[in-house]
Structures are given as C-alpha cells and as structure tokens.
Amino acid sequence: MSYGLDSGDVLEAEDPFIILLVEDNNAHAMLIMRAFERLGFTGRIEWLRDGKAALDYLRLHEGGGRSLPRMVLLDLRLPKVDGHEVLSQIKRSERLRAIPVVVLTTSTSDDDLRRAYSNHVNSYLIKPLSFEDLKRTVEEIKEYWLGWNRSPGPA
C-alpha cells in the first residue's frame, strides 16, 4: 500500500485498484488506511494532504499516460483548495467525471451536503466513520466501477 505520491511511477492498465485519499488530518488518514488493510485491500492508496495537491495529481493523470485513480476519498475541509472545489473540478472534467468520489467529512451541515450532491458526489460519509459504512460504500462503488468498465463478453 502506498502512503504518498510516487510521482515518477507510470501506471499500466493492469495496475492495482488505485484510491486517491485527500485528507489533511494525519490521524484520520491513518485510520482510513488501516481500515483498508483490515478489509484486505490489495490496491494502492495515494494519500495527499491538501486540495491543490489533489488537483495537481489529477491534472497530471488526466493528460493520459498514467492511470487515473478509480476512486477518490475526499475531505471537504482542506488547506489551499477546499474539497467542494476539488469535487467540482473533478465532475466538470470530461476525463475525470466518471471517477467515483466519496466525501469523508465531519460536517453535518445541510449546505455542505447539498453542495456535494449538486456537484454529483457518489457518497457522503460523516466522520467519525463506521468501519462497516466505509467497507460497504467502498465495496459498492468498487463493484460498480469494475462492472461499468468491464467489456461485454462474447455473444
């Protein structure tokens, strides 16, 4: 499992399932990564600590030649660029918009919830996270993603 950005790696199509975790709180990020270890997750987690770094990472991968993450776990309260703006830019990009985004936040604000869903977030989980909620959400989205990208078999 990768706990940071390996900016020199060029990823191939057969690379593992990659999750981009955008979380500025070290303790929260470690808990999330430990939860994935408990789930037996065999993919990679790329952990970035602010919204600007996330947008830079996505722009680099958006241009082609590098595999896009298959899921983004996104905090809303981030330094440099907030999570709402990151979500908005992901969903406005033709190449990025299909990436499922799960908001992980301490915010219970109706305004944050409305803004996230108006920007087409796939799921909205409130911290502290239940291991079961995180597991269910990630498994459902992973199944959707893999099913959506699967080519139809021979007729």
UniProtKB/Swiss-Prot annotation:
Phosphorylated by FilI. One of its GO terms (biological process) is phosphorelay signal transduction system. Residues 18-142 form the Response regulatory domain. Induction: Transcriptionally regulated by FilR1. It holds the Pfam family Response_reg. Gene3D superfamilies: 3.40.50.2300. The modification 4-aspartylphosphate is found at D75. InterPro entries: CheY-like_superfamily, Sig_transdc_resp-reg_receiver, TCS_response_regulator. Keywords: Phosphoprotein, Transcription, Transcription regulation, Two-component regulatory system. Member of the two-component regulatory system FilI/FilRs, which is involved in the regulation of methanogenesis. This is Probable methanogenesis regulatory protein FilR2.
